[in-house]
Structure formats: C-alpha cells, structure tokens
C-alpha cells in the first residue's frame, strides 16, 4: 500500500512540475541577409522571442556553429509573457565569398531546452576598380 501511495504522489508531482515551466517561442528561426559585398562583411540581425510559459525563462547558452558568427542574448530572466532578444553578428572578413548558412544553438531552462536559429546569406567578391 505504501508503494502505491508513493508512486501515485511521485506521478502527481512529476505531472505538476511538467506543466509549470518556462517556454521559449521565437518570432522566427531563420534570417536571410540576402546578398552583400565582402567590402561590408559584417552583417547583423535580431531574433525576438517570448516566454509563453508560466515560469521565468533563462537562456543558459547561445553558441554558434562557427567563430565568424557571434550571438549575444538577454542575460536576465524573462518573466512569463515578456520578450527577449538574441542578436547575431556575422563577420565574413577573411571568409570566402559565396553562400553560407550558420546555426546558433540556444539552450534554456525551459521547453524546448534546445532551439536552433539560423542565419544565411551570400557574400560577393569586392568590386575592383580597374
């Protein structure tokens, strides 16, 4: 009998914990810089997200797939219903011209725990004055 009561209580506690949590929802998960020249290799964009859960949301980490892509993000906890941002800077200096697509992995204390956002674009060669 004690085992059944213990298991029942653990199940109820687990279900309650599952429903009370932070939840991240991005306005968009991809951004296209379009075509730009290697004369202006630094491109920036902002991703906005909302905490649609019922607990404060914390971004624990934002990591890019390449050193040429730098994410910065809201460091303070985001209350339920509030918004935060992830700013992404792509620096194509010393990179080959052409199309690129970079992933940024966002880790949070909420659901989903891991979200990937993407930036892409096409960098063209600088025009030479001949």
Per-range role (PLM):
Residues 1-23:
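Bacterial Sec-dependent N-terminal signal peptides
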Residues 17, 45-51, 88, 102-107:
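Buried hydrophobic-core signal for structured, non-transmembrane domains
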Residues 20-48, 52, 123-130:
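Beta-sheet-dominated interaction scaffolds and their linkers
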Residues 43-45, 58, 84, 100, ...:
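Hydrophobic core residues within well-ordered beta-strands of beta-rich domains
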Residues 52-55, 94, 110:
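Short, acidic/polar linear motifs in exposed loop/turn regions
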Residues 54-85:
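Surface-exposed binding patches on compact interaction domains or structured appendages
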Residues 86-94:
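Short, hydrophobic beta-strand segments
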Residues 96-125:
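Terminal connector regions
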């Amino acid at each position: 009998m004690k085992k059944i009561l213990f298991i029942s209580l653990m199940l109820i506690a687990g279900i309650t914990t599952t429903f009370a949590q932070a939840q991240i929802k991005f306005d968009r998960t991809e951004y296209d810089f379009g075509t730009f020249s290697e004369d202006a290799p630094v491109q920036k964009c902002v991703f906005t997200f909302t905490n649609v859960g019922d607990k404060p949301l914390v971004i624990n980490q934002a990591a890019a797939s390449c050193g040429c892509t730098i994410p910065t993000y809201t460091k303070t906890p985001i209350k339920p219903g509030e918004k935060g941002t992830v700013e992404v800077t792509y620096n194509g200096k010393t990179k080959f011209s052409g199309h690129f697509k970079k992933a940024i992995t966002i880790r949070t204390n909420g659901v989903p725990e891991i979200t990937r956002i993407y930036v892409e674009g096409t960098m063209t060669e600088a025009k030479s004055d001949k």
